[in-house]
Structure formats: structure tokens, C-alpha cells
Amino acid sequence: MKKNDFMDKNLKIFRMGSKYLMPTYSRLPVVFTRAKMQYLWDANGKKYIDFISGYGCLNVGHSNKEVILAIKKQVGNIIQSSNLYFNSAQVELAKKLCDISGFGQKVFFANSGTEAVEGAVKLARKYSRDKYSQQKFKIISFNKSFHGRTMGALSATAQEEKQKVYQPLLDGFDYANLNDIESVKNKINSQTCAIIIEPIQGEGGINVSDIEFMKEL
């Protein structure tokens, strides 16, 4: 080992991480040890501006004072109660989300976007099976979309590069072109139960859905 390698804390921790963590991503050789709002500091104390923001989940900043206080308060009361019971914070947040959004009257809490998509796929198929028939199970998504990396969400992700090593995927997904209502109509048949769409696609550029297309959809 070179002297510089020994002194570089980033490299030391990076090598340890490469040894013990699954290589699900190609990581850059920098290791962050603390963060505050938009700033990050690596193991050597170098300061960075965070332009990734946890892919959006840290949009109020790292170590936000209000978030820290809310977490401490809740941890001091109750952390988890399982799905066998309600807890008061869960119920209050669900009501607030319904009131603010004005969209729907039910909330489904999940840990990630891919879990939200899995839940949506299951709900759409169960509803269609109960209301119509078992044959109404197909879901239309859009080319260049990204919905997650679990098997159901990956099946809705219309990107061959991301799907090919995990074949066979979940059956019953068709892919249309964004902002092309005719391509959607051509995919709809008696087996279609739902359409899943990102109003703004973020993979391979920023692809924005036209307002008229969304209205027709």
C-alpha cells in the first residue's frame, strides 16, 4: 500500500465498503461522513455541494433542524406499531396529506418509490379482478419510463437495458409512447386495467408530458 493510500481516509473506507457491501452501483471513490443543508463533507474533511439530494428525498436539506426535532419527538413517543394497529402520528399525517393534496381519500405509506409502484400494480389488478374479471390485468406504461428496480416496478419500466438481465419479468405490461395518444389507444384492449405514467420522465433526459396529452389520457 502506498503512503498516500494509507493517509487517504476516503480510500480506506471505500475499500472496506467494496469488500462488505453488495456492488449494486458503481460508486465514486469518495465517502461522506457528515452533512448540513446543501453541504457534504468527506472522510478527509473536504466540503462539497450536494446536487443529488438523495434523488429528491432530501429536498429540505441535510440535518434540517425542524426535521431533526420532529424525528426526536416521534422516537421519544413511539417508533413503530406494526400494521395491526394505528398510531396517532400515522393517522394525523394521513389526514393532512388527504386535506392538502385534494386527491383521493386514502393514503398508502411506503418506504420507497418502487414499493409505491408495486402497491399501485397490486391495487389496480385486484380492483379489476373484483369488479370485472381475472382477464383484466394488463397495465400500460411508457417508453423511457422508470418506475423502480423490484420485479413488478421493473416490468413497468420500459427500458430494455435495465430489464434484460432479469428476464422473465412480470407478465401483462404493454409500452406506449409518451405524448402519442394514438399509440396508447392502440395498446388498450379488453384486458387493460390501468395506465401508469410519470408526468415528467427523468431518465435519459427530461421528457415532459403535454397538457393536452394528459387530458386525453
Positions of the model-derived regions?
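PLP-dependent aspartate aminotransferase-fold enzymes
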Residues: 95-194
